[in-house]
Amino acid sequence: MDAVAAEPVSSSTAGLPAQLRDLGQQNYAPVWRAMQRFTDARGEHTADEVWVVEHAPVFTLGQAGKPEHVLAPGEIPVLQVDRGGQVTYHGPGQLVVYPLLDLRRLKIGVRDYVCKIEQALIDTLEEWNIVAERRDGAPGVYVGGAKIAALGIRVRRGCTFHGLSFNVAMDLEPFHRINPCGYQGLQVTSVLDLGGPSGMDAVKAVLLDQLARQFGLVLQPTSALPDLSLPA
């Protein structure tokens, strides 16, 4: 997917309301299934939502994922999921954000959506004087050739689910057990390793502000969690 330039939405512009749900630490599968249910059930007037979570250790294989890119998972489970992209790792210390947005309401296409997420990440890192960039044909955000944030999205009936993972202050060893995003030997890094803060809350606040700015959203925090039960 090629990078597409996108102008940020001014923070002074009146935005569209979106519910912000902080799920804390959760296993991957219940959140994935809840995203699917939300997207399947939403209608024309359903308010957008943004979910924030830290996952327990898991490798996920996207729709383009090849099992041979999972080299030595060991005790970490591997899940085949319905997002785009290849294999990645989620674990504690990684900030995962799932924007559940109606692209028709926002009047943007998929390329602009991806570009806006990448720009929000780049602008977040700039807060700590970390210079990041896109790569043509390889969605995500990179610092000095090392990947610091991955994207894996799905769009159904014009509505997005899945999202981004941002390495904040985490154990990066599990990435050595896979070919991250399908690239052999791809280096990964984290905000902490680059001199940024170790606290998740500080990074979370800046990233959510940048995402709201890019998409013209007014995030409305709610303590209510989605139904995270798994089907029997």
Swiss-Prot record:
Its main location: cytoplasm. It catalyses: octanoyl-[ACP] + L-lysyl-[protein] = N(6)-octanoyl-L-lysyl-[protein] + holo-[ACP] + H(+). It is an enzyme of class 2 (transferase). Keywords: Acyltransferase, Cytoplasm, Transferase. One of its GO terms (biological process) is protein modification process. Its EC number is 2.3.1.181. InterPro entries: aa-tRNA-synth_II/BPL/LPL, BPL_LPL_catalytic, Octanoyltransferase, Octanoyltransferase_CS. Residues 44-219 form the BPL/LPL catalytic domain. Substrate binds at R83, G84, G85, Q86, V87, T88, Y89, H90, A150, L151, G152, G163, L164, S165. The active site is at C181 (acyl-thioester intermediate). It is found in: Cytoplasm. CDD domains: LipB. The record marks K147 as: Lowers pKa of active site Cys. GO terms for molecular function: lipoyl(octanoyl) transferase activity. GO terms for cellular component: cytoplasm. It comes from the Bacteria. Pathway: Protein modification; protein lipoylation via endogenous pathway; protein N(6)-(lipoyl)lysine from octanoyl-[acyl-carrier-protein]: step 1/2. In the reaction, the free carboxyl group of octanoic acid is attached via an amide linkage to the epsilon-amino group of a specific lysine residue of lipoyl domains of lipoate-dependent enzymes. Catalyzes the transfer of endogenously produced octanoic acid from octanoyl-acyl-carrier-protein onto the lipoyl domains of lipoate-dependent enzymes. Lipoyl-ACP can also act as a substrate although octanoyl-ACP is likely to be the physiological substrate. Belongs to the LipB family. This is Octanoyltransferase. It comes from Xanthomonas euvesicatoria pv. vesicatoria (strain 85-10).
